């Protein structure tokens, strides 16, 4: 039964290409896209800082998030709201960390709570912060991609550390207009791996992979059965 549910989830995930925090191939911006350009910055910010902290923490079980560092988005980028004790970092990603060809790339409603372990905080998170800094500085999608790719090539942004992963278990997130909070899942970040080595995407496998060649990144996704508050995914 779980296998059937996971399989259905996987098909849906691939169809909507929902994955925030992973960039893909650059494509020309569709004039008919629902969000053709960046909205005013205020629409991406959360007025209540405590609400953003709570949303970020909802990405992982309380046993993890209560001692995690928490970042919130300000007008000039992410800021540390709470110092952590356990190496985890919780953050609410915005729409510009979605796939470059995602029609919701500029969706001001996008809120993706994610809680990264220490290895991911030292590697993957740096890319999210850099992308955000570039966007808030007025860069276009294409300019952001060019700058990130150059920083990776120059090793200004590090490769993924072994064991880099994150929790995305929040029922309060908003990943897309179509799917809202989608389903609870874990993600594992690897520098350009072969998905077949994980058995990703094979019939009956609960593991799925997204390859991002320009960013030299492979993200493995594993759906799970419960949200961070312990309630089942239905």
Language-model regions: role of each:
Residues 1-9:
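N-terminal secretory signal peptides that target proteins for export/translocation
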